Amino acid sequence: MTGLDVSQPRISDYHFRHKHVARQAGDASKRNGRRHMAQFGNEEIGRAPHGPRDASGKRSLSERFTEWSLNWVPDSMVFVVALTVVVFLLALALTPHGPMELLDDYAKGFWVLLTFAMQLTVMMITGFVVADSKPVKSTLIRIVGIPRTARSTLIMFCLIVGIVAWLHWAAGLMVAIIMGKEIAVRKRGIGLHYPVLVASAYAMMMLMANGPSQSAPLLAATAGNFLEKSIGGLIPLTQTALSPFLLVFVLFELLTIPFIFVWLTPGKESAVDITDEIHDEFTQAPPAENTRRSDLRPAERWEHSWLPLSIVGVGILFWIANFVATRGIGKIDLNVINFALFGIGMVLHGSARSFVASVKQGVGTTSGVIIQFPLYAGIFGLIVHSGLSEVITHWFLSISTPRTYAWIVVIYTTIMDFFVPSGGSKFAIEAPYIIAAGQKLGIPVAHVINAYSTGGQLANLIQPFWALPFITAFRVRFQDILPYTFVIFIYAIVLASIAFLVLPAGL
């Protein structure tokens, strides 16, 4: 997951500017035993009556943890700037390069990721466009009506969000929000606990970190990447995201986590539904656009016509089908994925008007990639050209063995991604020493990449930064879902430890 729109409001704007309002609302909720709404800034955020406070009225561990995180973990842009300073000082202290030489190193690396950043930007936008199409939305809405019970609804929701997020994180985000809102509206009164529903949407997004749309495996599989020479060539997706080892790991998570959420759901008498206010907001129809052909100018008729985009889109999909048939899945790289998403998006939207409108909306998710990737590339230049990568590689070797190294990478990445929520962007600066240490220990590069990706998914479960789209869309607070996602975090840590300490890398 890369590049959340840095212009989005932080959850702290909703909560900590008016904490006293939330506390008063919480006390009122306890008195009347009903779900309530608390006003935070300009947004209404729903809360569960048995939310983060305990019976004595004290702030719970989840609320204190959330407050600490939101008070002290800044925006990712601040992190990358701070990392630049820290790495510069480390290189100055630990390598023979002086200040001007280090600035030269920084400049050498600054534009190394330019091509990759553009590729990721296109992938994020096109994935959003596919999920934002009318056929996908209408299909998801129809699927919501199939299950009848809270249990079956929650399991179905988790499975669909997990699968789509694994395929493409931006599409998974859209699917989670579209389906989640529809479920909240249509399944009121069946015992489906709203905080658990939102928590399950966010938690199942964790599977994206081990999917084929993630930065690390895509970078290693794409020709001309900056690591190609150091790792001895390209590493196909069949050795990383599509490897038997990682597929078994992801499949086990996919099939077990939904049942944990079922177990975490309270009884029907204690389950919390959305309020009437949120119900009205979720069901408000957008203004209808006048598309009567007789009222359109000739240019507008072409914009609304299905013919131009459909011809190009179908042609692209024929090429993709031929590519897979003749070259195989192992040859798929970032460019092929983007090409396929372009074609699918064109076919699903039909008209240029709909396609372009969706693209404009999806562009907002890419600002982090556009602005931050050059900064990460500059840090990469500092680490590689100054010799700092050799120093850090030695540190890793001093605490690792061939059996424990992959697990150490998992834990290291989990910790780093909690404090530096870059969504995989920082792989560019960590790859030189993480991969080099693994190579010296005889660990396959693909297995190191798999461990790195797995650590990223774990951190997201307890990091509120990436929860912002869910918090704003579903009108909840992070501490309302943290108790549930924290349980999944502990479970996933145990699974990852077993996988990378016990199971063979070549599974």
Regions found by a protein language model. Give the residues of each.
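Re-entrant/interfacial helical elements at transmembrane boundaries that shape
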Residues: 1-3, 12-17, 31-41, 138-141, ...
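Hydrophobic alpha-helical transmembrane segments of multi-pass integral membrane proteins
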Residues: 1, 146-179, 370-386, 397-436, ...
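Membrane-interfacial loop-to-helix junctions in multi-pass transporters
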Residues: 4-12, 75, 110-117, 144-156, ...
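Membrane-core helix-loop-helix motifs of multi-pass transport proteins
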Residues: 15-17, 179-273, 467-499
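Early transmembrane hairpin of solute transport permeases
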Residues: 1-4, 8, 113-225, 419
